[in-house]
């Protein structure tokens, strides 16, 4: 409801997200925020419908008055003293594709909605925000966006989505003392040279390194069994090769078998005395299914054999199909997020999202709105408390995430990289243990 039309302009800017009270009127809300009724209706397209009725609890985007926006674009830059943010107010910029043209835009609109919901929650806790949003689509002019006077006054900026836009925005943020939060996957190593960048996404190499470290921490006394799944499209060689090197360096023996091996040959790869940890060299579902079938046969022949599995983030997408097997074979699934729809706080936010935006969150893992909510909560709280000293380390964390934990570590001579790593341990008791590193 709120964003379908409002993000079409290059630089929509909102001064507040307002919850309608019992005796509110459209005129009264406009007067309260110093805007015209037309400006309020333009920011909230549903208000332009013939059958529209203002309802208690409804969420309305409150734009800045047009005359204020014009003045901001034409006046001279403020002095450093006047640019200092007001106490308990954080200026937030969002530079992402905010449109309904394609999947990129639709996903980022949901992420942005999560950011707005976080700002609304924080306001109730005494932390105010000014949110400035720019529709930075794939072919947008980065220079035009950065020329907006409001961009310089941001305390932090979420974005961009596209790799080619990172360097100019990163340079701008470094020049103006702004924290740049890159929320999704990008290519390039700007975080290694720009100390104002917070990179949430973990590269394949970093993910493999963290996964190997967690494996060695949990399974030093186990017997690893690598299963070659004959998948020529797999990208998991980065992890399996790194794990085998570590095992060899520490003198830990392991076996390799193949999905095409006969049942007796497959069984020979397993230890009768130690706990066996099965590692596939692909994350795809068909090969996982075939491996589980072989493990079922193995367990039938050797009921007392100890088996665990060390998987991949993709396995969470197959949870509805294989969850019983995850419990049966004690699957350990590495991930950077934990989505639990039954958790009261998560269920509450999803319910409020449905009420505010008249739609459900996209069926994606992780949920984009929850990602935006968690990241906004984490960074806005941190900057409000620590100002320019905020660096996102565990010692400064003041927020318990709904889905997406964050833990940043300084890259040598560069910015901050998210190093948070989680193992989900599916226990035979049909409970899930969350192990956070």
What are these regions (language model features)?
Residues 4-6:
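N-terminal signal peptide c-region/cleavage motif recognized by signal peptidases
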């Amino acid at each position: 409801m709120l964003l379908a039309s409002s993000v079409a302009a290059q630089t929509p800017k909102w001064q507040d997200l307002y919850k309608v009270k019992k005796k509110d009127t459209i005129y009264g809300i406009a007067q309260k925020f110093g805007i015209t009724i037309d400006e309020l209706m333009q920011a909230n397209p549903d208000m332009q419908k013939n059958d529209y009725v203002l309802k208690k609890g409804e969420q309305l985007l409150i734009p800045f008055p047009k005359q204020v926006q014009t003045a901001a674009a034409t006046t001279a830059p403020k002095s450093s003293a006047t640019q200092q943010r007001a106490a308990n107010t954080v200026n937030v910029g969002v530079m992402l594709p905010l449109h309904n043209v394609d999947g990129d835009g639709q996903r980022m609109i949901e992420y942005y909605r999560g950011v707005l919901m976080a700002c609304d929650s924080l306001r109730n806790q005494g932390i105010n925000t000014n949110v400035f949003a720019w529709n930075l689509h794939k072919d947008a002019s980065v220079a035009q966006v950065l020329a907006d006077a409001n961009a310089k006054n941001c305390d932090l900026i979420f974005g961009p989505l596209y790799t080619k836009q990172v360097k100019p925005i990163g340079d701008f943020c470094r020049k103006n003392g702004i924290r740049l939060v890159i929320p999704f996957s990008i290519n390039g190593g700007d975080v290694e040279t720009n100390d104002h960048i917070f990179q949430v996404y973990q590269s394949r190499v970093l993910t493999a390194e963290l996964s190997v470290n967690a494996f060695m921490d949990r399974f030093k006394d186990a017997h690893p069994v690598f299963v070659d799944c004959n998948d020529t499209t797999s990208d998991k060689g980065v992890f399996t090769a790194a794990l085998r090197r570590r095992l060899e360096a520490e003198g830990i023996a392991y076996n390799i078998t193949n999905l095409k091996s006969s049942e007796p040959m497959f069984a020979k790869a397993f230890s009768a005395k130690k706990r066996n940890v099965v590692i596939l060299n692909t994350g795809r579902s068909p090969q996982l299914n075939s491996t589980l079938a072989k493990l079922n046969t193995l367990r039938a022949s050797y009921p007392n054999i100890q088996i665990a599995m060390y998987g991949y983030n993709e396995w969470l997408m197959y949870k509805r199909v294989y969850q019983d097997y995850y419990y049966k074979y004690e699957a350990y699934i590495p991930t950077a997020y934990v989505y639990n729809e039954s958790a009261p706080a998560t269920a509450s936010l999803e319910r409020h999202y449905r009420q505010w935006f008249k739609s459900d969150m996209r069926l994606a893992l992780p949920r984009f709105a929850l990602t935006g909510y968690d990241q906004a909560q984490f960074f806005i709280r941190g900057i409000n408390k620590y100002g320019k000293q905020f660096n996102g380390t565990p010692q400064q964390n003041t927020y318990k995430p709904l889905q997406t934990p964050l833990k940043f570590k300084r890259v040598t001579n560069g910015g901050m990289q998210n190093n948070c790593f989680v193992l989900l341990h599916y226990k035979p008791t049909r409970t899930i243990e969350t192990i956070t590193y």
